Amino acid sequence: MENWAVQSPEEPGFHAVVTPDKSSCKEAWIYRLNLNKGDSHTLKSGRLEMHPVLCEGAAVLSGNSALEGVRLEKYDSFYIPGETDVIITAQEDCFFYVAAAVCEGYGEIFVRKFDPSLPIGDIHQIHGEGTGRREVMFTLAPQDKASRLLCGFTWGGEGTWTSWPPHQHEADLEEVYCYFDMPKPHFGFHISYLKSADVEEVMAHHMRARARRRPKHGGRPSRCLPCNRSPFR
């Protein structure tokens, strides 16, 4: 469990953060794209489906007829299936987390604009109660046309749990948590354990803006320090 946390790079460029050949994950890839204002990057999906989510800044898309001229602002996202290219140009300094998985030939390009006013339903959801209450906003929902990926944002309250009680999805999901919006001195803890309902042996990882991977076993409550929120996607 010691190596389950990975610091995502902050320098400009397109960076592989979690990949099956270098982690315990077998199905999931996570990339981070950092662009300075005015810089561009051509995203090429190849054999993967990709889901970039803008966590900071603003950008515009080009080079693909289905996405031409689309402007992205904070928390907006889009999806591309395999063998698809798109140019991302930063209108402000920005960074994306990019989730990816093997494309099985199923998936359609789409853009999802972040809308916090959406009613509770398929995209906007509330889970848990009390200090375990959390708000979920899907960026790539179960009903969307994609091969393997499910993605979304989760926000907890200030100083509360964002995943409580401890639970896991090892029967059918491999999960990666990408933390954001926690600049210094803000931080939280991601607590990992291997055996269901056995929390005697746990590992706590310090979290700011980094990725935390988890294979198909173990659990993961996460906790934010007082006066902080612990958002992840």
Where do the protein language model's features map onto the residues?
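A short glycine-rich, His/Asp/Glu-containing loop-to-beta-strand
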Residues: 9-40, 129-177
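Short histidine-centered beta-strand/loop micro-motifs
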Residues: 41-46, 163-169, 205, 223-225
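Conserved metal-binding segment of the jelly-roll/cupin
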Residues: 72-91, 99-101, 204-229
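Non-transmembrane, aqueous-exposed alpha-helical and coiled segments at domain scale
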Residues: 2-10
